[in-house]
From Swiss-Prot:
Protein name stated in the entry: Precorrin-6A reductase
Pathway of action: Cofactor biosynthesis; adenosylcobalamin biosynthesis; cob(II)yrinate a,c-diamide from precorrin-2 (aerobic route): step 6/10
Gene from which this protein is expressed: cobK
Oxidoreductase listed as a keyword: yes
Biological role stated in the UniProt entry: Catalyzes the reduction of the macrocycle of precorrin-6X into precorrin-6Y.
Reactions mediated catalytically: precorrin-6B + NADP(+) = precorrin-6A + NADPH + 2 H(+)
Lineage top rank: taxon: Bacteria
BP-aspect Gene Ontology terms: cobalamin biosynthetic process
Pfam families, sorted: CbiJ (PF02571)
């Protein structure tokens, strides 16, 4: 079809759409790009100003909710949808499950395993960023805020603390906090570097999301070594869809579902 994201000269190939934005999504796209059996594309939400290049055809921007995604899946004749978005991107995951149900397209979720506390960890588990704000308490603390920029505004109600805020892109609009430092950086972050950062800023508590994976685990390991508390925002219950924990598992599932009849 005109304007298609996919290769219109290869209509016989099953079309796979990856909903991306994670390291795992990019790795899966790279491996699928090397497989001539499939026609693969990836969609990014467009929340970062300078997204990394992808190894397959790329779409950037939202779909307009579950309705828009369902129309796209139908119009592009998608055979398989892979939800490889961030574990905390609950809205797009919900939309993907809804769109798959409406269209009858196969859907799998690629979710990196959660981190689990190890001996020496000082975790305070909370269910939301709002709860994390409350968990800081009233006493002034030196906080390393490592939850991304989208929900950082919640901490404006706790201006008594000192904040070091790390994100890929600047927090906009700027936070109304009297004592804050912004660090713009993209992982992976090594444990030694994270420990040096925590020491230099005299951090006594980290606020993090349980995103799993190795790229941002350095701060968790460094906190364990230094005896620093981590207020851990746990994941919400995922949508009830088939889920795999690695690219290898995803490729096996894809090969099974899209095997020639």
């Amino acid at each position: 079809m005109a304007g298609s994201l996919f290769d219109t000269s290869a209509m016989e190939k099953p079309r796979i759409l990856i909903l991306g934005g994670t390291t795992e999504a990019r790795e899966l796209a790279r491996r699928l790009a090397e497989d001539v059996r499939y026609d693969t594309a990836i969609s990014l939400a467009g929340r970062t100003a300078d997204p990394r290049p992808q190894p397959v055809k790329t779409r950037i921007g939202g779909f307009g909710g579950a309705d828009g995604l369902a129309h796209f899946v139908h119009d592009e004749n998608i055979a398989l949808l892979v939800d490889a978005t961030h574990p905390f991107a609950a809205r797009i995951s919900h939309n993907a499950a809804d769109a798959a149900q409406r269209t009858g397209v196969a859907l799998i979720a690629l979710r990196r395993p959660e981190w689990v506390p190890l001996p020496g960890d000082r975790w305070t588990a909370v269910d939301s960023v709002v709860e994390a704000v409350s968990a800081l308490g009233d006493r002034r603390r030196r906080v390393f805020l490592a939850i991304g920029r989208q929900e950082a505004f919640h901490f404006e109600v706790a201006p008594q603390h000192s904040y070091v805020i790390r994100s890929v892109d600047p927090v906009t609009p700027p936070l109304n906090l009297p004592d804050q430092e912004a660090i713009l950086a993209t992982g992976p972050f090594a444990e030694a570097d994270e420990a040096a950062l925590l020491r230099s800023r005299q951090i006594d508590v980290i606020v993090a999301k349980n995103s799993g994976g190795s790229a941002t685990y350095g701060k968790i390991a460094a906190a364990r070594r230094l005896g620093i508390e981590v207020i851990m925002v746990e994941r919400r219950k995922p949508a009830d869809v088939p889920t795999v924990g690695s690219c290898d598992e995803a490729l096996n599932r894809i090969a099974h579902w899209l095997a020639p009849a």
